[in-house]
A protein has these predicted regions:
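Nucleotide-activated donor-dependent transferases that construct or modify glycoconjugates
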Residues: 1-12, 172
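A short, glycine/small-residue-rich beta-strand->loop->alpha-helix junction that serves as a flexible
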Residues: 7-19, 45, 177-186
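Short amphipathic alpha-helix
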Residues: 12-27, 41-44, 191
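Conserved nucleotide-sugar phosphate-binding/catalytic loop shared by glycosyltransferases and other
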Residues: 33-66, 110, 222-227
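Conserved nucleotide-diphosphate donor binding/catalytic pocket of glycan-assembly enzymes
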Residues: 56-151, 166-178, 272-275, 281, ...
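Nucleotide-sugar donor-binding patch of glycosyltransferase catalytic domains
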Residues: 108-109, 227-228, 256-310
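Active-site donor-nucleotide binding/catalytic segment of nucleotide-sugar enzymes
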Residues: 149-216
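Donor-binding and catalytic core of enzymes assembling or modifying cell-surface/extracellular glycoconjugates
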Residues: 189-266, 270
Length: 310
């Protein structure tokens, strides 16, 4: 039995998008032991993933921390990996391929490029298309790469939500990383007022903040869902998304979860990137794209909501 390593760091959205690829790798290597190298934030979630046999943590400390790199190298070598699938394709993982695990069977963007093809050109393709090409070049049958199965990650949290509301609900994610303020739409408070005016008898308005977003969430006129005063864990978040009637979000991790669950909803895009490039749309989860989010009116969003909820 061979040991295979998959590397995926990055954000929640990045990891969510990779789960379909991870499933394809596992199903093409059923007799192999599959390990995932990822961030500590995702240990609990991915420890329950049926396509992963072992979750390894990478603290991603600075590369001048030679003691940490030595320990990580020693740990990785101890597993006798025969193949590596680098789904992160970052400068860090390129460094790992040279100095930590110099294996001949290392699948990455660079090993995927056609002769003469530039990585900068390849990176213009949608992320899931790139991932599919990478897996195919490595001999993996790609049946799930473009649609991650997330059912295994869902935890039923109705015992939590019933203390907040009893109706169906519209779930809103008005947050984003402070480093990516250009992704943030500024008019959610107005939108919530308009949603309440139109749907108050049928739908509650719900927010699910992360640990650093709780105080901000309380500024909105909506139910802020917490578990004993703390942010929901990732499995609980998946459960909340699964039961939502409609979802409106910035371009963040939860939006990618919504897309792969094919939930009815909208994701709002400015000029920071495109819905096409990040592969975020599905049959029911659609995008509204504008050059400048500050000019996106709530009336436009409401018109799209009404197409589904009316």
């Amino acid at each position: 039995m061979s040991n295979i390593l998959i590397i995926k760091h990055g954000s929640l959205g990045d990891l969510t998008q990779a789960i379909g690829a991870i499933e394809d790798i596992k199903k093409s290597n059923l007799k192999s032991h599959i390990a995932l190298l990822t961030s500590s934030h995702y240990f609990e979630l991915m420890n329950g993933c049926p396509y992963i046999d072992k979750v390894l943590i990478d603290k991603r400390l600075p590369r001048w921390n030679l003691f940490y790199l030595y320990k990580l190298k020693k740990k990785l070598i101890s597993y006798n990996f025969t193949h590596v699938f680098d789904l992160q394709n970052s400068s860090r993982t390129k460094f790992y391929s040279k100095y930590l695990l110099n294996l001949p069977k290392w699948s990455s963007t660079e090993t995927t490029l056609e002769p003469g093809q530039l990585k900068s050109d390849f990176d213009k393709e949608p992320v899931l298309k790139r991932m599919q090409i990478q897996l195919k070049k490595s001999g993996i049958k790609t049946e799930h790469v473009k649609k991650s199965n997330l059912n295994w990650a869902v935890t039923n949290i109705r015992h939590i939500t019933k203390s907040y509301f009893t109706k169906k609900y519209i779930l809103i994610f008005p947050f984003c990383s402070p480093k990516l303020a250009s992704k943030k739409w500024s008019y959610y408070s107005i939108l919530i007022s308009q949603l309440k005016a139109r749907y108050n008898n049928k739908y509650d308005i719900v927010l699910a903040p992360g640990p650093s977003e709780i105080n901000e969430a309380k500024e909105f006129n909506a139910h802020v869902i917490l578990d004993r005063g703390k942010a929901l864990n990732l499995n609980q978040l998946f459960g909340l998304i699964k039961d939502a009637s409609f979802i409106i979000a910035n371009d963040t991790g939860p939006a990618h979860i919504c897309a792969h669950m094919n939930k009815p909803g909208l994701v709002l895009f400015g000029s920071h990137t495109s819905a096409y490039k990040v592969s975020i749309e599905s049959e029911k989860f659609k995008s509204i794209s504008v050059k400048d989010l500050s000019f996106l009116k709530t009336e436009i969003v409401m018109e799209e909501v009404k197409k589904v909820l009316n």
